[in-house]
Amino acid sequence: MAVGKNKRLSKGKKGLKKKVVDPFTRKEWYDIKAPSTFENRNVGKTLVNKSTGLKNAADFLKGRVVEVCLADLQGSEDHSFRKVKLRVDEVQGKNLLTNFHGLDFTTDKLRSMVRKWQTLIEANVTVKTADDYVLRVFAIAFTRRQSNQIKKTSYAQSSHIRAIRKVISEILTREVQNATLAQLTSKLIPEVINKEIENATKDIFPLQNVHIRKVKLLKQPKFDLGALMTLHGESSGEEKGKKVAGGFKDEILETV
């Protein structure tokens, strides 16, 4: 008879549960701050694992991209169909300082603008801003009926479409090249460029629903902390000396 363990007697107790550890105990919250070009700078909060050993939480936060509705940033429902992407560039305490990373339209807004009896015109340009950000800007426009028109349709000819597309590309290139990223963002929010395109093309063919529907960041320059702090309305923390009024002369002691 073989001598060994009796498996029936040495079975462990069933029903013992493992200790459940809440995963949120290993995480911490950080506040996301939008640039000062937006009305509401408090975007929201994000989670990340706490810093342990060689793993630093800031390394996992930098480069994180969040998508926010522009209506929440501006406090107005007029911008509810536009989405803004913000990229985390710096971690300061529990605050995450972000920069503009892109702009896009919601799908329902784009579909609602496409209708019968009109022509859709699209144009896009790849331009470098004054502060060396390479952007690809997409514009969209639709033809409309003239004031004294009887015909139901408002289709544009191919020559009109080419001429309008050329004007749109020239305006987009000029506006992006002569502005920094922060200045361009302040123009995109109130849709200043859209009105300029509409006025410039009215002699070719009247347009409606002219929008910058998308802005895509292709390349960014080397990270500059001072520029980011200025964008957020804060100093870069560098202490600079002040010039003293009047000259300073050493006193010479004649007697010891």
Curated annotation (Swiss-Prot):
Family matches, as Pfam families: Ribosomal_S3Ae
This protein's GO CC annotations: cytosol; cytosolic small ribosomal subunit
Coarse class of the protein's main subcellular location: cytoplasm
Cellular compartment(s): Cytoplasm
Highest taxon of the lineage: Eukaryota
Residues recorded with modification N-acetylalanine: A2
SUBUNIT field: Component of the small ribosomal subunit. Mature ribosomes consist of a small (40S) and a large (60S) subunit. The 40S subunit contains about 33 different proteins and 1 molecule of RNA (18S). The 60S subunit contains about 49 different proteins and 3 molecules of RNA (25S, 5.8S and 5S).
UniProt protein name: Small ribosomal subunit protein eS1
